[in-house]
Every structure is written in C-alpha cells, then in structure tokens.
Amino acid sequence: MFNKKSNDALLAGIRQGKTLTHNEMLSLIVGLSIPSILAQVTNVLMFYIDAAMVGKLGATASASIGLVESATWLFGGLCSAVSLGFSVQVAHFIGANDFVKARQVMRHALVETLAFSLLVTLCASLIAFRLPGWLRGGDDIAHDASLYFLIYALSVPFLQLGILSSNMLKSAGNMQIPSIMSVLMCVLDVCFNYLFIYVAGLGVPGAALGTVLSIAVVASVEAWFALFRSSILALRLDKERFVWMWSYVRNAVKISAPIAAQYVLMSGAQIVSTYIVAPLGNFAIAANTFAITAESLCYMPGYGIGDAATTLVGQSMGAGQYGLCRSFAKLTVGMGMAVMALMGVVMYVFAPEMIGLMTPVEEIRDLGTQVLRIEAFAEPMFAAAIVGNSVCVGAGDTLKPSLMNLASMWGVRLTLAAVLAHWYGLQGVWTAMAIELTFRGTLFLIRLKWGAWLKAEGGVEKNNADGGRQALL
C-alpha cells in the first residue's frame, strides 16, 4: 500500500488501459494520499510554529500577523492556480503515455510562472504599507503587519517555483518527494525562526524572514528533483530542440483562469472576513488567526486526499478510462469525508489544547476554543467540497466548481457573518462559516452525482492527430 514501486506499477496499469480491482484502487488512493497528507500536515505545523513563536511576544504581535495573513494566502492561491493549468495537462499527457509532451508543457510552465510571480511580487510590494489601513488595523500593529507582508511578498518567485515543482511531481505520481520537502521546510522554519525572532531580536519581521528562507531553500531542492531527477519529467530526457507552443499556454489559461479568479475572490472574501472581525478587537483577531491555524490541522488530510484525487482522475482521463475516473471520484470523496469526520471529533475534544499551544493569553484561548468547537460539526461536508473540487480539477473542469465556491463564500458566508458578527461577535462569524461549508459540500456532492464534470464523456474528441488519447479538451 505504501510501496512506491507498487504505486508506480498501478499507475502504469492505468496508462496501459488495465482494469483495477476495488482493492487496488483503494491501495493506490491510500498510497498516494499518505505522503501528501503528511506534507499538508507538516505545512500546518509550520504555521503552528510561526504562531507559537510569535504568540510568545504577545497579543499585539499575533494580531499584526493575523491582520495580513489572509492576504498572504492569496500568493499561494495564485501560484497554485497558475501551476495547476500546466500540471493538469502534464497529468493528462502522462496518462496518455506521451512523456515528451508532458516535459514540453513543464518547460512552458517554468517560463510563464516565473513571469507571473515577478509581477505578483511587484504589485504586492507597492501596496504593503497601505494594506493594514485598508483592513482597519490599529496603529499599534500596522507597521509590523506591513513589514511581514512585504517580506513574504518578496518570496513569491520561490513560492511559485516550489508549488510548480511539487505539482509536477504529483502529476507524475511522485508524492514522496513533496512530502519530504515539506518536512524539511518545517525543520528549517523552526531553525530560522529561532535565529531571527529570538537571537537577532527581530520579532514579527523575523518570523517572515524565517518563513521566506525556508521556502527558498526547499523550492530550490524540489525544482532540482523535478527538472533533473524525475524518471518521467527530467529535462535531460528530451533529445529534440525546444519549440514554443502557444496551445499549451492557451490550455493552461482555460484551466487556470477560473481557479485564479476563484482564489482572488476567495482571498478577497477572507480579507472581507478579516475586515468584519477587526472591529471586534485584538483578542478576536488573534483568536480568529489561531483558530484558523488549528482547524487547518484537521482539514489538511482532505487536501492530501484531494491531491491524490487530482492525480488519479487526471491520469485516468488521459488514458481514456472514464469509468475509472468516476470510481476514483467516489472513493476519494468518501474517504475524505470519513477521515475529516474523525478529525472533527478530535478538534472538538482537544480544542483548548490546540489553541493553548499557540498562545498563553487566556482570553484568546477561551475564544479560540469556542469557535473551533462550532466549526467541528462542518468538517465532513468541508471534506466533500475539498476533494470534490480536486476531482473536478483533475478532469479539467474548473469553471463551474469555481463559480460554486464563489457563490457559496460570497453569497452565504460573508452575508451571514456580517449579520451574526453584530449580534454574536466572533462566534457568529464562525457559525456563518460552518453553515457555508456545509452548503458548499452539498453543492459538490450534487455536482459529482449529476453534473457533467467528466467532459470527455460528453462527446469531446478522444483521439489526437497522433492516434493517442486526447488529454486536454
């Protein structure tokens, strides 16, 4: 189940058109999910470390990061969206056994994503010292919040390279290297944070520097594995001269544009949520930030299973095995809901300890515990939304799922949060979140059951000019 050779053999069987048994599908899902789950959990631990180290500096330092943290998520979201446009194509080509085109797509991705990340860095740097004011942050936290945001923004090119390399390796079925790199990033983050926050005495900017340096080191190593060590994607395997193909870029835009728009508007919604929370005071801002970090430990398994779903659905679709696509969709969504239901129970029971790890301030701990227990009830349906969306991405179906996410976030969560915050404070904001996640999960279950997410079944061309499977349209 956890043997890489066994996973590779099963993936090769998909590409060759073989029929997998139910046990083989489960084995492959678990085998690909476990490393990805570990990677996701490690990423959360890194945020825990940042929060815990900064939390010891007091509520003001925690609030300064919490004020702009939702804005920094936009960087990762945009970088992920742009890289997915190319990595989904790579998964489809690998599924069709066309490794040459898979490497061609990756070359295009390197150029396009570098240009994009530099543009994002420039734009973010220009607004860094205005953002805290826009978010209604107090004067006592504005300066540190601006510095944290600016330093993090400068890491975007490395962040983009790391996300792209990770997604490419996952598209090829290699979940182990991204997982190991996530562990390495966590270790480096601890070391760099200790050095800059405590030894150098830099406080909040030191936390940003520690994170940025760990991102840069890990991105460089991960890119080396993707570009030079992968048995499928290593650039040295190409014998022909590289030729620019605009069709790959156009396909990437078709896949990425809805996801990028979704990330922008979803991050905008998170920023609006911060805007709603900010007037509730520094304790509420800090409790909100810590609760989000604590909850992420519970939903990261869903994202890990979602990574496996994207890879398996993508390669199955590239191989023309559309029945297998649906089987993987059902199994991954069911597994995600079961795992996150269990994590919801854990979160409810251990909420005080989870918040307590990050702050010694009693008011923040009490408030954070209350909102975590509200959210625990929504975890299974949150899993349906996470894994369901990943299934659709693997199939190249991104427009309607993006619209579903946006309608749910803006039409349900923010509307309810604005109303409930007035009457119930932070607890009202998180009640709105729990209701919205349940609604969104329901939408994705309906989409997977009755929607036309598997486009190839609807009569789209199944053979390309070379006689192989049509992987992209």
Label for each model-derived stretch:
Residues S83, Y152-K170, P178-D189, A207-E222, ...:
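Short runs within selected transmembrane alpha-helices of multi-pass transporters and secretion channels
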Residues V41-A63, R130-D139, L195-L202, V264-L297, ...:
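Helix-terminus/linker motif at the lipid-water interface of multi-pass membrane proteins
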Residues S36, Q40, A51-A52, E69, ...:
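Transmembrane alpha-helix boundary and packing residues in multipass membrane permease domains
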